[in-house]
Amino acid sequence: MSSQSSPISLTNNDLEISSNNNKPIIKQLPVPTNEIEKPVIQNIVATVELDCTINLQDVVRRVRNAEYNPKRFGALIIRITNPKTTALVFHSGKLVVTGGKTVDDSRLAGRKYARILQRLGYNVKFNHFKIQNVVASCDMKFAISLKELIQLAPKITKYEPEIFPGVVYRLADPKMVLLIFASGKIVFTGGKEIEQINKAFSEIYKILLQVANNDN
């Protein structure tokens, strides 16, 4: 799995919008494509199986940057600064790594956390490393009519402005959830691979061109 985003290029095919007579038309771009902010990874959540039960009370006494409050949460929290990440360690031996900006950083952080526990005498392994969620964000640099967006795709959108200011958009392929704001900002969640973020961006870009709010 690649740890870097592949470049996204937008061609005329990406900008085609079907008209009523089924002939594609090209909608005038709200802003030049080179001004649009491509998705940037904000957080990667990964899991690892250590295949070893962990005495969390023992670890919190012996590791400096560790926190454990079983009344509030059933996992031990450890933080490291390089790469800057946070780990949740469960008694069962499950390790959750959050805060990574690349897959390689997440894997490296996971190995460092495993090493910390190994130095304490735990016979840990590093098995089944898996990316569970990739969160990214971008700015389209043009305003979006959220009302038009939910009219365009009523079955896969949810908009409750009194509760949340953005549209929740459920993309089918790739299967992800996007949070879309009137300002043009988008948050991508639920991706399992970096490539899915890029594909989701290309898909939503074509849709948002149809609901660009040129009045703002």
Swiss-Prot record:
Keyword Transferase recorded: no
Domain of life: Eukaryota
Pfam families: TBP (PF00352)
PANTHER family in the record: TATA-BOX BINDING PROTEIN
Naturally occurring in which organism (per UniProt): Entamoeba histolytica (strain ATCC 30459 / HM-1:IMSS / ABRM)
Gene: trf1
UniProt KW Transcription regulation keyword: yes
Single GO MF annotation: DNA binding
GO biological process: one example: DNA-templated transcription initiation
InterPro entries recorded: TBP, TBP_CS, TBP_dom_sf, TBP_eukaryotic
Protein name: TATA-box-binding protein-like 1
Family: Belongs to the TBP family.
Localisation: Nucleus
Sequence repeats: 38-121, 126-210
Keyword annotations: DNA-binding, Nucleus, Repeat, Transcription, Transcription regulation
Any single GO CC term annotated in Swiss-Prot or TrEMBL for this entry: transcription factor TFIID complex
Lineage, uppermost ranks: Eukaryota, Amoebozoa, Evosea, Archamoebae, Mastigamoebida
Gene3D superfamilies xref list: TATA-Binding Protein
Protein role: TATA box-binding transcription factor. Members of the TBP family are differentially required to regulate transcription and development during early embryogenesis.
